[in-house]
Amino acid sequence: MKIIAVGMNYAAHNKELHHSLELSEPTIFMKSDSSLLKDGKPFFIPDFSSEVHYETEIVVRIDRLGKNIAERFAHRYYNEVTVGIDFTARDLQNKLRAQGLPWEISKAFDNSAVIGTFIPLEQAGDVNRLPFHLDINGSKVQEGNTSNMLFSVDKICLLYTSPSPRDTR
């Protein structure tokens, strides 16, 4: 299984983090199998970070093999969606970026990719206009809509040329 993640895909979040609002290509990174946390299991803040941030995300499950997928056919390669949380050890990420080093470990640590229960796209609605939010202790702390993504799910699928069935994105 591969967990393919897309960073800096929302202009508002990029502005908050002082990143460029103009990207020519999505920022793609991988998460390891051990990053996956599901079935309502608890998340524990890792010992190596004192500044863990969360980002609510839409997660799409790839269900077909494909290569060199045309954008107009990309929707045929995924059929389920859920909400996820992408945890980031922000202090570690900032330190690694400042040194010009890869920062993937700050996002790909154990249990850093929380996912909910997948539902069929037919029940979820248009993947390009899905609202989502995160509540903590009854208070809404994040909300978004896939219509605000800089790169659509279909566009991202074009870059992922050899998906394995059951991959999550």
Predicted regions and their residues:
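Catalytic-core "active-site belt" of small-molecule-metabolizing enzymes
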Residues: M1-L159
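Single conserved hydrophobic/aromatic residue that forms the stacking wall/gate
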Residues: P163-R169
